[in-house]
Amino acid sequence: MPPRLKRRLALETAQRHGNMNDIAVGILGERYGVPVEPTGRRSTTPGASGVVVLRMPEALKRSLKADARKSKTTTNDLIVRALAESLGVEGRKETMASTNGKGNGRVRSGDKVRVAIIGVGNCACSLVQGVEYYKDAKADEFVPGLMHVDLGGYHVGDIEFTAAFDVTTDKVGKDLGEAIWAHPNNTIKFADVPKTGITVSRGMTHDGIGLYLQDVVEKAPGQTDDVVGILKETGTDVVVNFLPVGSEEATKWYTEQVLNAGCAMVNCMPVFIAREKYWDNRFQQAGVPIIGDDIKSQVGATITHRVLMSIFRDRGVRVDRTFQLNFGGNADFLNMLERERLESKKISKTYSIKSTVPYEMADKNIHVGPSDHVPWLEDRKWAYIRLEGTAFGDVPLNAELKIEVWDSPNSAGVVIDGIRLCKLALDNGISGSLGGPSSYLMKSPPKQYNDDAARDLVEEFIRKNARTKKKEPASKA
């Protein structure tokens, strides 16, 4: 919603001593001849975001959708136009007219990338901060951790958040700009985030809270909110999955909601969705793309380990044994004390490392995985890597390395690239698992390429599908 219109609606709300939802929906009801009963609920304080979620009767939703189909526009544009005319404010000039996928009926925003977040933890905090921090960066500026400030015609500042879902009392019901700092989040602050106008909705718990994590967080009361409805009403393009490690059932449940809403997905955690043929087919059938699984960091333990393995390989040293031990103090490491939740994470990291050499390594000779939770490290992670190899003359050659990072900011830029790559795919009708982007950005993609080849594939994907240049035929490589 344009800021001017949002301010006018807020003023009208104050003058009528009502709430924003009732007034806006009442205006729409009068326009479409649909009776509307006031809810009496208080409105969320308007924030800096242009996103306003309206709760309205099903009959009014149907009328809006029918009018949108007839007018070949979006329900969002119809709402903005109706409110602007009623309140005497100049409305939206541009329309959201580009479709996505294989004609699945969703109409996409042309100039923005509308993003919803599942799991408002440290990673979500760093993502929201990152968009705020770099929203005004120059298009040709070098920004650490991003492939491009302007990626295929989408600037970092073109990302706008539309919805967020969590299950804890400290976050549900709060503005996203506040919730990212709520307990137990403990990452570093590098940007001042204003109120967003996005209220964190009550998500589905399933297996999202582990045995150890349940001792430090409290589940929010009440029913799970209508995830599909919220994603549709907000015109969300891309959903980012930041659920805790081990949330197998919760991830699959949310994936179904994403598919039903007709959104793209960036799966940042190690539950295998993008790499599984079943889910790849489901995303193709829905006409939407997915990038996954298990986000890489900018320079983290996995990419550093892969580089060391590649150096040994390229210089003719056989890797006989290797390990990677990780320590951290965030909620993810606390969750991973429950070893049963580690299976997919361990598989993901091990797969990423083993794929760098052209020979099989026995399971006993490779150990990769989280090791312990150290509370005072907070969102910092320490990783210890050791390689033992055999060089010329069967002489031993060993290497050790320690890396210290702030865990969540280390992947935020990678997620920003993934979001925009998904948007390019949506714009160009590309669906299913995106091979090149998944290989470059994720630890467990459908197909693993070496890092240089994967980056080349992503650059080719951007070149072919960019909206700022003449495009070659669309490709999902």
What are these regions (language model features)?
Residues M1-P3, A10-T13, V34-M56, R69:
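Short Lys/Arg-rich basic patches
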Residues P2-D22, E58-D77, R81:
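Surface-exposed, Lys/Arg-rich phosphate-binding patches that contact polyanionic backbones
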Residues G18-G40, T73-T95:
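Short, basic amphipathic alpha-helical segments that act as recognition/interaction helices
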Residues G101-Y254, L342-I347, A383, F392:
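N-terminal glycine-/serine-/threonine-rich beta1-alpha1-beta2 phosphate-ribose binding loop
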Residues I118, E160, K171, A182-N185, ...:
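Active-site-lining helix/loop region of Rossmann-like oxidoreductase modules
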Residues P244-N260, C268-P289:
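Rossmann-fold NAD(P)-binding glycine/threonine-rich loop
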Residues R282-I295, G316, D320:
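Rossmann-fold dehydrogenase core element
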Residues G413-A477:
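NAD(P)-dependent Rossmann-like dehydrogenase/reductase catalytic/cofactor-binding core
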